[in-house]
Curated annotation (Swiss-Prot):
UniProt protein name: DNA replication and repair protein RecF
DNA repair among keywords: yes
UniProt-listed NCBIfam families: recf
GO function terms (MF aspect): ATP binding; single-stranded DNA binding
Function: The RecF protein is involved in DNA metabolism; it is required for DNA replication and normal SOS inducibility. RecF binds preferentially to single-stranded, linear DNA. It also seems to bind ATP.
Cell compartment(s), UniProt: Cytoplasm
SUPFAM superfamilies in the cross-refs: P-loop containing nucleoside triphosphate hydrolases
Main subcellular location: cytoplasm
Keyword field: ATP-binding, Cytoplasm, DNA damage, DNA repair, DNA replication, DNA-binding, Nucleotide-binding, SOS response
Signal peptide: none
GO CC terms of this entry: cytoplasm
C-alpha cells in the first residue's frame, strides 16, 4: 500500500513540500544537512507518531513555528486513495486523521502504514540490549495478532502497579490477585511472540543466507523466564527477590531474540558492514513475512544507503528490495551510490536547504 503523495509543513528545515511519489523506488539525493533524512523522518512520524531521531517534539518543529503537519495519501488494497495525516503542537499535543476522521489513535496509523527503517544507527538491533530486539519482534506481532497491542499495554500497566506494591506488601497474598491476570497476559504474549518468530524464522534465515552466504544464521526466542515453569509460579517463587530488587525481575518485558552466526553471537563475529547487511536482511524478512501473512506491503525507509556497504553489498540489497515489489525511500549523498537501484519506474528528488525538487 504505497504512498502516492506526501505533504510536509514546518518540519525541521522543510518549510513546505508537496511531492508525488513512485510506488517503487524514491531517491532523495543531496549533501549532508540538506533535509533528505528529514523527509524519511517525516514519513516515519506519519506511521509511528514520533521521530526516529528525537523524542522531543519541539526539536522537529521548525524554529518560530508552533506546529508541524505531515499528510499522506496511499492506495489501499482496493486501489482507492486514503488520506492520513498527523499534526503535532509544540506543547506535545497530537491530532491524527485517517480518511478525514479526526481523533484517531497512533496505533491505527501504524496499522495502515507499516514501515521498516534502516539507518546508520540501526546496529543497535544486534549489538545493544534486548529492548531493541523486543521492539523488532513486537512490530511483527502487532501487525499479525490483533489482540497483542491491548494485551501488551495491559501487562505493562499491571507490571508497573505490581512494582509499586512490592514496596509495601507484607506477604505474597497481597499480590496474588493481580498476578493471576499478569500471568495470563504474559503467557499469551509469549505464545504470540514465539509463534511469530517460528513463522518468520525460515524467511529471515533464508534472506540472511543470501546476504551473508559465508555464515549460517540461527534465530532463537527467549521468553524472559524459565521455559519449563508457568509464569504464575515464577511470580510467587521470586516474590522475596523481586521485593529486594524493587521490581519484577522476570517476564515478557525481559524477552529477547538471540541471533548467532555459526553458533557465536553476531556481535562477536561480524564486521560493521556485515552487521548492517544482517540488519537489512532481518528488516526485509519482516516485510516479506508481513506480506505473506496479511497481504500488506510495508514501506522501507533507508537512510544513508551507502554507509558501511561496498558496491557488491549495495547491489545485493537493491536486488532483494526490487524483488519484494514494495515502496522504498532511499537517501544518498550522490547518484552514483544508488546506481544499482535506478530504473525507469523510480523517482529521483534533489534536496537542498529543505527544498525538494
Amino acid at each position: 500500500m504505497p504512498l502516492s503523495r506526501l505533504i510536509i509543513q514546518q518540519f525541521r528545515n522543510i518549510k513546505a513540500c508537496d511531492i508525488d511519489l513512485s510506488a517503487g523506488f524514491n531517491f532523495l539525493i543531496g549533501p549532508n544537512g540538506s533535509g533528505k533524512t528529514s523527509v524519511l523522518e517525516a514519513i516515519y512520524l506519519l506511521g509511528h507518531g514520533r521521530s526516529f531521531k528525537s523524542s522531543l517534539t519541539g526539536r522537529v518543529i521548525q524554529n518560530e513555528c508552533d506546529e508541524l503537519f505531515v499528510h499522506g495519501r496511499f492506495l489501499n488494497s482496493d486501489q482507492f486513495e486514503l488520506p492520513i495525516g498527523i499534526n503535532k503542537q509544540r506543547d506535545g499535543s497530537t491530532e491524527v486523521k485517517i480518511g478525514g476522521q479526526s481523533g484517531q489513535k497512533l496505533a491505527q496509523l501504524a496499522q495502515v502504514l507499516p514501515l521498516q527503517l534502516i539507518h546508520p544507527e540501526g546496529f543497535d538491533l544486534l549489538t545493544d540490549g534486548p529492548k531493541h530486539r523486543r521492539a523488532f519482534i513486537d512490530w511483527g506481532v502487532f501487525h499479525t495478532e490483533p489482540a497483542f497491542y491491548d494485551a501488551w499495554g495491559r501487562f505493562k500497566r499491571l507490571n508497573k502497579q505490581r512494582n509499586a506494591l512490592l514496596k509495601t506488601a507484607r506477604s505474597y497474598r497481597e499480590l496474588s490477585y493481580w498476578d493471576q491476570e499478569m500471568a495470563h497476559l504474559a503467557e499469551n504474549i509469549s505464545q504470540w511472540r514465539a509463534l511469530y518468530i517460528e513463522q518468520m524464522k525460515t524467511v529471515a534465515e533464508t534472506i540472511c543466507q543470501t546476504f551473508l552466504p559465508e555464515f549460517e544464521i540461527q534465530l532463537k526466542y527467549y521468553r524472559g523466564w524459565d521455559k519449563d515453569t508457568p509464569y504464575h509460579e515464577i511470580l510467587e517463587k521470586n516474590f522475596e527477590r523481586d521485593q529486594s530488587l524493587g521490581y519484577t525481575f522476570s517476564g515478557p518485558n525481559k524477552a529477547d531474540l538471540r541471533i548467532k552466526v555459526n553458533g557465536t553471537p553476531v556481535e562477536d563475529v561480524l564486521s560493521r558492514g556485515q552487521l548492517k547487511l544482517m540488519v537489512c536482511a532481518l528488516r526485509v524478512a519482516q516485510g516479506q513475512h508481513l506480506t505473506e501473512m496479511t497481504g500488506k506491503q510495508c514501506i522501507y525507509l533507508i537512510d544513508d544507503f551507502a554507509s558501511e556497504l561496498d558496491s557488491q553489498r549495495r547491489k545485493r540489497l537493491a536486488d532483494c528490495l526490487k524483488e519484494t515489489g514494495a515502496q522504498v525511500f532511499v537517501s544518498s549523498i550522490t547518484e552514483s551510490q544508488i546506481a544499482d537501484m535506478l530504473d525507469d519506474t523510480g523517482k529521483l528528488f534533489h534536496v537542498e536547504h529543505g527544498r525538494i525538487e
